[in-house]
Amino acid sequence: MSAVLGYESAREAERVWVDGPGSHRVSCAYKEELLAALHDLKPRRGARLVLFGADVGELAEAERAALMRRMGFVPANGGLMSSLNAWENISLPLAYHAPEKLPAALREVRALLEELGGVGDELLGKLPEHMTLYERRLAAYIRALLEGPDLLVMESLAAGLGPTKRARAARFAEVYQARRPGGTFVHFDA
């Protein structure tokens, strides 16, 4: 049971198994079921979720919480708080979980914005309702990346984006791997 991410659906013989570090595109008939199980680390009755080699159903709550801290998740729509601008959405988790990283974070965020979006500082002041789909995903991706997860799951990497933005989004996996060489990047695009 060495899978970084594994899921067996209760409904059919649907199985998702990601065995090692690197970038993985996953196709899954029960994507929503799997994403829900990842979100709260509680697989549906009869299903099985494996993270970092551990069967989540057999873990105590404290052990599940420890696994959750090793994961980053980016919803298809970005999952940003509507009343916070991009910088506030990006920096809020750091303020709670790693306040010592905040002083250097703005420099790092600016470099990532330039590298991945070519958008510069103007994105940082935007509210989600004024962002494009790509900008929302970019902000959410950067937010997750700054926390340094061992497993980064993107619900959708390129769906709904035009060719230029799809090409930029395709670099998310490359940038993640450069920062977390032993980490695993998973997305669910077809």
Name every feature range the model reports, one short phrase each:
Residues R44-G57:
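Conserved ABC transporter NBD signature motif
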Residues A140-Y141:
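Hydrophobic anchor residue at the start of the ABC signature
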Residues A144-L145:
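ABC ATPase C-loop
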Residues L41, R70, V74-M81:
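Catalytic "switch" loops of ABC-type ATPases
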Residues L112-E129:
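Conserved ABC nucleotide-binding domain
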